[in-house]
């Protein structure tokens, strides 16, 4: 979740998954030299960072870059990737336009395999014939097992620059092997990829596959909810399985569309900052939306990639309606960032935590599923035979899981691979 102060180019970023606007008192660096940037990061971190008391006393001038300095001072027990520094232009493109430079696919890595989870429309990957469920065998002449074993898989597709060419060998689900060459360009991620209505035993059940909480999401969600209201939907399955979070303002909009009249004006979340910034603490509330649904409960599909603003939706609605989780445990990110633009970069330090109307919010272990289900990549998203959606529809129809969910672990479990910065929300190449 993100927010940002006005001085840092008020950009509405309420995300990481909870982004918000940076405090108005933030000033830019004295210079854009390496030492100037590092000193700027020190000044911001020692003021707004949620765990500022844990920052070690290291000389920022000794570090080669602000990224290296930030990595050295972050509070690693809880902040291994959340606070970040990134390129200012690409950060803005993602949050304002839902765009990034790449080939347009997201993947999962298990053991020595890379599988395709999603291919974005009108992307180089789609044009090359890649699809959900395909196995990527080689990237630029190197086998995927070798790339994984040597820790080189993250950079295997090359830099995020327009014109970079990538050679990919993949095998489709029928067993056919194909070699393609794709060229990176600007790719747009649809924030709402699917809106469906299923008729199950006389019930109208709505389904929304929601990919990220960015500015274009507001219009896309309004369109989706208008369709569901017109169809007379009385139940909703919200698919957040690959949604790593985004803007808090978008989470507020979505929560209000789901909560409807029963949550209107109620507390959605309360901000808590460190003691130096307690004056910034405030409460945001559910709003009135003419296209809101009238729901008695919400069913959410999640995986370990569901984080931040996705988890905020679950936590914020639970005081007012049952929120049932199908799939896997969520990531566990109950903290948010303000974003500060400086020179050609953006700094997003963990700055606050959010709690719901019952004061609940420390979900660093994530939320456990009520009904366990696999992310079934053998079937398309939105297909009623896909395991997670099938389980969600079963839960709505019968009131029970098809099989018991596993017991929640008693101690923090580290989730799977997660990139730093806005790239963790894209989770794509």
Regions picked out by a protein language model, each given a short descriptive name:
Residues 1-12:
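Bacterial N-terminal signal peptides that target proteins for export
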Residues 21-23:
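N-terminal signal peptide c-region/cleavage motif recognized by signal peptidases
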Residues 31-117, 165, 171-194, 415-425:
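Extended, small/polar residue-biased N-terminal targeting/export presequences
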Residues 41, 105, 125, 133-136, ...:
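Terminal peptide-recognition signature
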Residues 96-138, 142-146, 207, 214-218:
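PDZ/PDZ-like domain segments forming the peptide/carboxylate-binding groove
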Residues 137-233, 286-287:
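C-terminal, low-ordered peptide segments at domain boundaries
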Residues 190-191, 244-300, 336-340:
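Gly/Ser/Thr-rich loop/hinge elements
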Residues 388, 396-429:
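C-terminal functional modules
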């Amino acid at each position: 979740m993100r927010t940002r102060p006005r001085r840092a180019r008020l950009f509405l970023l309420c995300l990481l998954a909870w982004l918000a606007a940076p405090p108005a008192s933030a000033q830019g660096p004295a210079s854009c030299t390496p030492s100037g940037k590092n000193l700027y990061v020190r000044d911001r971190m020692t003021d707004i960072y949620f765990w500022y008391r844990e920052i070690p006393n290291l000389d920022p001038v000794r570090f080669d870059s602000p990224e290296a300095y930030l990595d050295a001072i972050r509070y690693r027990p809880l902040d291994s990737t959340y606070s970040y520094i990134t390129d200012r232009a690409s950060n803005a493109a993602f949050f304002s336009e839902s765009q990034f430079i790449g080939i347009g696919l997201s993947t999962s890595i298990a053991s020595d395999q890379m599988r395709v989870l999603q291919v974005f429309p009108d992307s180089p990957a789609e044009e090359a014939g890649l699809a959900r469920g395909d196995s990527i065998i080689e990237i630029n002449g190197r086998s995927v097992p070798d790339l994984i074993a040597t820790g080189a898989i993250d950079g295997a597709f090359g830099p995020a620059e327009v014109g970079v060419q990538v050679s990919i060998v993949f095998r489709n689900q029928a067993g056919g092997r194909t070699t393609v060459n794709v060229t990176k360009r600007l790719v747009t991620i649809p924030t709402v990829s699917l809106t469906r209505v299923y008729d199950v035993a006389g019930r109208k059940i709505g389904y929304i596959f929601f990919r990220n909480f960015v500015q274009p999401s507001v219009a896309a969600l309004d369109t989706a909810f208008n369709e569901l209201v017109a169809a007379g939907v009385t139940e909703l399955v919200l698919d957040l399985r690959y949604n790593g979070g985004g803007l808090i303002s978008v989470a507020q909009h979505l929560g209000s569309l789901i909560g409807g009249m029963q949550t209107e004006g109620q507390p959605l979340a309360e901000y808590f900052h460190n003691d130096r910034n307690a004056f910034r603490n405030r409460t945001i509330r559910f709003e009135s939306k003419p296209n809101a649904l009238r729901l008695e409960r919400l069913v959410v599909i999640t995986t370990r990639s569901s984080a931040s603003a996705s988890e905020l939706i679950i936590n914020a609605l639970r005081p007012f309606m049952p929120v049932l989780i199908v799939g896997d445990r969520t990531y566990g990110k109950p903290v948010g960032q303000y974003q500060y633009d400086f020179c050609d970069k953006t700094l997003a330090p963990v700055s606050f935590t959010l709690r719901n109307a019952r004061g609940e919010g420390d979900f660093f272990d994530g939320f456990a599923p009520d009904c366990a289900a696999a992310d079934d990549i053998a079937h398309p998203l939105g297909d009623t035979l896909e395991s997670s959606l099938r389980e969600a529809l079963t839960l709505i129809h019968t009131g029970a899981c098809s099989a018991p969910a596993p017991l929640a672990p008693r101690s923090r479990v580290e989730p799977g691979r997660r990139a730093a910065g806005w790239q963790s929300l894209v989770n794509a190449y």
